[in-house]
Amino acid sequence: MTAEIQSAYLAPEGLNEPLLKEIEGVISVQDRLILSSQPFINTYWAQNIWKNPKIIHIDSINDAAKKLESNQRNWCLYSFILHRRAKLIEEKLNSRKPKLLTFPTSLSGDPLGSWCLLDENTILASADCTSPFPNGKPSFIEDKSGPPNRAYLKLYEALTLAEKLSLIHI
């Protein structure tokens, strides 16, 4: 299975089915992560797409961190199995910690890769992902006492992504 993976798609919470209808060559579904034997395509329902993921065989937690950091600096974990081992690897990485965003904001130019454990000694990692946010989910500072409220958070996300796509200038 691992040699065939050419792309991976992270579905939003509860939306695996619409995403599965868009993707061909599905190898397996791991929680919200859908693995495909086909090169990546842009989809409507993916929260994040892992372009050209690589299989990395590891011997230890330290070995995993070294191999990930040799590919790039910033990584985001998507954990669906072996949560404790994955967290230990994540702690060894020198990745920048995601911070809450204020609106309006410009997105960082630093690329953010995504990775997961497929089993105890195998990592699936992609240094090239479609979303600049950890697991495709932005975290804006929320004003809990007055406007703006939670409804504005989706608007903030949409406008921030529109700026990334050069559709608007904030």
Placement of each model-derived feature along the sequence:
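SAM-dependent transferase fold signal centered on methyltransferase-like domains
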Residues: 1-168
